[in-house]
């Protein structure tokens, strides 16, 4: 979302330092998940670049799946949110790399919470995700990287393009897997039986 990148202050920290911080955050996320008992890779014994079957035990176990689009959308939203909150602070304006680190912290924290026993059981009880037992570490880290991709894309794309892509993702996911970021949040916070029944149907497209 190119809200006004020309007004952003230039990062005083070298690019290598930002990359190092980002890698450390990913390593920390992976370490915490490992300490929580999450499996490094799919228990099937291999890693796929893409797994497109949502209602299966391998969903959220490989590098990318249909929910990766939702994590790209996280990046869109985090770019806009951090721009509004931090880009023009009078005392401490944050450069875009610093705001990306903030976004990675938020995404990483959510990945850890999402893989807690409480949230896993919440998904299984309140949604159609009966085969969901949490993410593999490689999938969780990949989700954070998908968010980074969305953040970087939002930085260079016009706002209207970012919004249109986000809407296209939501519509595509709703029609193909009967789920998306909006429905995911709704069913996690306040499950609705009618929505759950609708989600159990076959792909619309």
From Swiss-Prot:
It is a multi-pass membrane protein. It is found in: Cell membrane. Keywords: Cell membrane, Membrane, Transmembrane, Transmembrane helix. The chain crosses the membrane at residues 16-36, 66-86, 157-177. Disulfide bonds: none annotated. It comes from the Bacteria. Its main location: membrane. One of its GO terms (cellular component) is plasma membrane. Belongs to the UPF0314 family. NCBIfam families: PRK00944.1. This is UPF0314 protein bll0647. It comes from Bradyrhizobium diazoefficiens (strain JCM 10833 / BCRC 13528 / IAM 13628 / NBRC 14792 / USDA 110).
């Amino acid at each position: 979302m190119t809200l006004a990148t020309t007004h952003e202050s230039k990062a005083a920290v070298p690019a290598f330092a930002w990359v190092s911080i980002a890698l450390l955050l990913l390593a920390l996320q992976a370490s915490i998940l490992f300490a929580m008992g999450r499996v490094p890779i799919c228990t099937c014994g291999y890693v796929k670049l893409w797994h497109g079957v949502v209602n299966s035990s391998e969903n959220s176990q490989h590098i990318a799946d249909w929910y990766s689009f939702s994590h790209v959308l996280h990046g869109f939203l985090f770019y806009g949110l951090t721009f509004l909150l931090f880009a023009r602070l009078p005392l401490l304006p944050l450069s875009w790399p610093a705001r990306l680190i903030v976004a990675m912290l938020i995404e990483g924290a959510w990945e850890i919470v999402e893989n807690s026993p409480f949230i896993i059981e919440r998904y299984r009880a309140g949604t159609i995700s009966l085969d969901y037992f949490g993410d593999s570490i490689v999938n969780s880290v990949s989700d954070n990287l998908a968010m980074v991709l969305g953040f970087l894309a939002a930085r260079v794309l016009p706002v209207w393009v970012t919004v249109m892509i986000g809407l296209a993702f939501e519509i595509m996911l709703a029609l193909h897997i009967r789920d998306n970021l909006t429905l995911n949040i709704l069913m996690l916070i306040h499950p609705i039986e009618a929505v759950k029944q609708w989600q159990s149907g076959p792909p619309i497209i």
